[in-house]
UniProtKB/Swiss-Prot annotation:
InterPro entries: Aminoacid_DH-like_N_sf (IPR046346), NAD(P)-bd_dom_sf (IPR036291), THF_DH/CycHdrlase (IPR000672), THF_DH/CycHdrlase_cat_dom (IPR020630), THF_DH/CycHdrlase_NAD-bd_dom (IPR020631)
Gene name in the database record: folD
Signal sequence annotation: none
Listed name of the protein: Bifunctional protein FolD
Known function: Catalyzes the oxidation of 5,10-methylenetetrahydrofolate to 5,10-methenyltetrahydrofolate and then the hydrolysis of 5,10-methenyltetrahydrofolate to 10-formyltetrahydrofolate.
Gene3D superfamilies on file: Leucine Dehydrogenase, chain A, domain 1, NAD(P)-binding Rossmann-like Domain
Binding sites annotated in the UniProt record for NADP(+): G165, R166, G167, T192, V233
Entry keywords, A to Z: Amino-acid biosynthesis, Histidine biosynthesis, Hydrolase, Methionine biosynthesis, Multifunctional enzyme, NADP, One-carbon metabolism, Oxidoreductase, Purine biosynthesis
GO cellular component labels: cytosol
Family: Belongs to the tetrahydrofolate dehydrogenase/cyclohydrolase family.
Subunit field text: Homodimer.
Known EC number: 1.5.1.5, 3.5.4.9
Amino acid sequence: MGAITLDGKATRDEIFVDLKQRVSELNASGRTPGLATILVGEDPGSQAYVRGKHSDCAKVGITSIRRDLPADISTATLNETIDELNANPDCTGYIVQLPLPKHLDENAALERIDPGKDADGLHPTNLGRLVLNTPAPLPCTPRGIVHLLRRYDVPIAGAHVVVIGRGVTVGRPLGLLLTRRSENATVTLCHTGTRDLPTLTRQADIIVAAVGVPHMLTADMVRPGAAVVDVGVSRVDGKLTGDVHPDVWEVAGHVSPNPGGVGPLTRAFLLTNVVELAEQR
């Protein structure tokens, strides 16, 4: 008997139904939410992500604004674009699509975003608010992971969660999210300096793999019945591949597919952040 699928696409569709209703109510009150994107260069993966975000906007009625810039732009031009969106009343929230070309400073670009328009929840001010547990836009992927686990009634309170990967978009903020009183999990954050990773993962009720190493989590590292969330993204022979080996499905109780698991919810909560920002105005 295989694991239960944590279906991100079906869960996203449920969120979109709710968002569509909320956007309709905002429009009726004269507050039309708008999501903007800044895309620098022509990276195919980034272009696909941005297209998907604007397609999602159309599905729920959010206005979408695109700022596509050539790869060789200067820091000054990028800053001007960020400043323009900060001042644009039609833009409720926006994102700078990462990665940026190497000559541009990603951290400086993220810091220049108005924290009140930070749709990704990755501005240093908003990450600080997450540490303090005060209201702010939440990072989309960690929020999607928690929602997906709840949707399938995977117990979080009191659970031991092993998060593999300490990146700023998933690993670090996920640990903060899961240890809030509302989630109340115990989190072990693992990384390249972790000794004897398999011993730790075999103790986990929930494993979140977010390192971008193809099939690094294998069945012998998973306790029978554990929930496994696959967030890592790599390309093998031109195909998107996750961090979780296919044999894990025979051992785990729940597994999120990749693609089709957390990814759709990352995009759904990007729109949710924008709608919530509009509702607060």
